[in-house]
């Protein structure tokens, strides 16, 4: 056992002893639930922080505050609630009267304090402790330096401690909540209806990904946690709901990385009588408006860069982007779509770029890999990449002028994909053929290929109007708004391997 663990165990034992010592004096419960707060710290700071000492004394304002003790300096306590911090002061007479109970308070304890509001000689507001009540005894100590945890794994495993001691973490999740609320309000104003679709699917679909598998005991059948809500949302458009959206979780049984978590949040929406270009316009309006609403500016820092959400955003085809970011590669500069359709040409090109290829990859998959390796990471400013090949876009409408590609885009900021959208494939026969091609790909070893969904084909046969749909990754968007570089910093409880 390390010295640090021994010290912590000793502190825990001391705190447990303090809790036991107060139990006999508690008529009902050592964790009372009758104290009522009248003000939060920020309310008091905002309303009375500009008053002089004399004005506050003349006012004689009495308040009740509650929160966690974050520091204890002689007669002063620093108390933190959800809004901020304020001090409490045990003047000599009160401290003498309540000396034993006051001395028993520890950093981390949750207390309620009632008293008159004053201003210290340093200009800090404080509440004179005329009365106080221990509401919850903290049995475990907080990290010594309450201005932050340094161990990243502890921050993720014990998010509750991270939120107590790290203001930056708290503000990141406050911003996350604001981003989600702003998106929801924007969509409702645009006359989209919020809906909820199943989280467990009989057939996984709507994206190319490996699903989590579970078992339904009552029905005695396998089921899948959803990888995307797309096919259910489009069924609703078939049913006559012309504008729908859903903000919810998706689950993909894949790797962990700074930009991937197996459980993540998406906002997915569909609008009838629109195409992928309308989606790009709507995305520009959405992001610029919420940036201004939440940050006061369309420009925001991200790492060493300044991201400009003001628009208009760059729009490049995938082939154009590859050529733009490989200016010295003569083969790429001369490449045409006819060559992109040549499987051997694409394999040789990928290998020449140092890409390890899979034998079952199609021309479209090879093009996407080349884009990902050579261009994607350079897209720091908001950029729409269009012209995705049909063989990697099984749910997207083919382009009228070039049937090899689809009317699809992915949206990139900060070198990563944030959104994916396209004009929806509403040709039931074409969708049937593409599902069958996905089944062949799965049989060839592609674990992320889609399943055949006969019920969705039946829905399309009833008629899906011209429709465009898009998914926006909430977690990655929040990473931008909080200037963080790992998805774990914006997910309250990220996936972690259990501790040994």
Swiss-Prot record:
Its cofactor is Mg(2+). Homodimer. It holds the Pfam family tRNA-synt_2. Mg(2+) 2 binds at residue 417. The keyword ATP-binding applies. GO terms for biological process: lysyl-tRNA aminoacylation. It is found in: Cytoplasm. This is Lysine--tRNA ligase. The keyword Membrane does not apply. Belongs to the class-II aminoacyl-tRNA synthetase family. It comes from Shewanella sp. (strain ANA-3). It catalyses: tRNA(Lys) + L-lysine + ATP = L-lysyl-tRNA(Lys) + AMP + diphosphate. Gene3D superfamilies: Bira Bifunctional Protein, Domain 2, Nucleic acid-binding proteins. Binds 3 Mg(2+) ions per subunit. InterPro entries: Aa-tRNA-synt_II, aa-tRNA-synth_II, aa-tRNA-synth_II/BPL/LPL, Lys-tRNA-ligase_II, Lys-tRNA-ligase_II_N, Lys-tRNA-synth_II_C, NA-bd_OB-fold, NA-bd_OB_tRNA. Coiled coil: none annotated. Keywords: Aminoacyl-tRNA synthetase, ATP-binding, Cytoplasm, Ligase, Magnesium, Metal-binding, Nucleotide-binding, Protein biosynthesis. Mg(2+) 1 binds at residues 410, 417. GO terms for cellular component: cytosol. It comes from the Bacteria. One of its GO terms (molecular function) is tRNA binding. It is an enzyme of class 6 (ligase). Its EC number is 6.1.1.6.
